[in-house]
Amino acid sequence: MTITIELPDTNEQRLILLRDGVERGCKALLNNLNAPHYGSVPDFDAAIYGEKHLLRENEGWQAPAPELIRAWFGQFQTVFTEYDSEDKLAALFGLHGKQGGRRIRAFKSGEMPIPYGIWRHFLVLTGRASQEIIPVLGIFDMTPKNGHQ
């Protein structure tokens, strides 16, 4: 007796996983709206720094002033004590190694402008910007169907 199990081809399996990932992503985005709410930095008026630091790169983004970086990073580090050092904050942003904490200090001091990707990551983490959803322009197979290309 032979038992046969019909499985979808690898491209169809990948599409199933893609759909599952999209559904999980939608749930995660909705769940982000339930994050705890925190007030603004006491005695700090972020409005005087304009809004260009909140824009996307293709909309005319400009690096934020170091005073704003210090204030917002400082508040974040006070609220989330697991990131209370520059090294820990650097690791959160994917800056690993001995220079990560030094780079955070350089952003805070104005010695070095903060890169867009790190700043955008921070804005999303703090609910100051929404995550960008990249549109899928096409779903391309990774393997030939039925042995044909």
Regions flagged by a language model, labelled:
Residues G97, M112, T126-S130, G147:
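Short alpha-helix boundary/capping elements
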Residues T2-D45, E57-E59, S130-Q149:
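Short, charged recognition helix plus adjacent turn
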Residues E86-D87:
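Helix-turn-helix DNA-binding elements, focusing on the entry/boundary residues of the two helices
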Residues S109-L123:
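Short, basic-rich loop-to-helix N-cap that marks the start of a DNA-contacting helix
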Residues A90-P113:
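Recognition helix of helix-turn-helix/homeodomain-like DNA-binding domains
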Residues R24, N32-G39, Q75-E82, G110, ...:
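Surface-exposed polar/charged interaction patches
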Residues P42-E82:
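A short, Lys/Arg-rich alpha-helix, primarily the initiator
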Residues L92-L95, H121, L125:
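Short acidic/histidine-centered micro-motifs embedded in hydrophobic/aromatic stretches
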